């Protein structure tokens, strides 16, 4: 079949995709050899889902005569649902697969499965005494700031609600193996994508320069989950007690967007700005629904940036759509696309979103931080 050359729109869209792939690889490979490399992978999980799924959809939906074509990958036949759910966790209450009720249910189930898993070895009349002090929740911090929890990581790994319902202790033991297989398949797909983009004249940095993160340290404390949620419930006083896990997850996304991903991706990364805007949009809506009394009011100018459905769609998808004509002629296509939608420059967008993220992080961290959680640490846990 005869193919046609890239259109001008495809050319700029592929340039942006190649940059995002390079940035994702930088975030995935950069921590190699870092003492906290295992913990730094948690904040990048939604980005893996976003870049892989959106690039696959972009190529798969190209016209039949286009130079673009879907890649022959096993990622989506083996882990398609996991990719979708990994990417969807950034949506929090806005996830179309269950909404607020679905997120609450999977977080509660992740908690109960963790309790069962960690208590499993301690059966019998004597060892059962240990169970009272057995941790079932790990929380990761950068400084005082909570960036991830193991209860939220389970669904963020792409494990669905139905899968988690059927999980046994043996399945939990195999999570590391599953995670490795998933990450390996993501790596294979990104290599295929980089090769294809190179054939179209788009360069992907397969061995990007490692970020300087020597001073970025992640600490870890173990807890009995019920004690943490009791303290968080008292501190946040959400509209409904069942929302407390979602509030903690939103805080983790916000802090990852502020304290981890800028170091891994670079502060001028389009992929970073996508994540920060998506976090402000979805975490903002989730927190407005759960703890509105804590959030600061936002002005109409801020709302234009933080609650724009058009901006959300531009960040969540790889096609430029109505913003393409403006983006094609610009030195910064992504910034130009944003400005064409809301008449706000990229620098102003970055200032607004960072101010909101910092303000909300400060307000929530004043109520839930490494120091405030210290009295809840499990006696039998691991702490750093």
Where do the PLM segments sit?
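Amphipathic alpha-helical interface segments
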Residues: 1-304, 340-384
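Histidine-centered, metal-coordinating catalytic motifs and their short helical/loop contexts
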Residues: 301-339
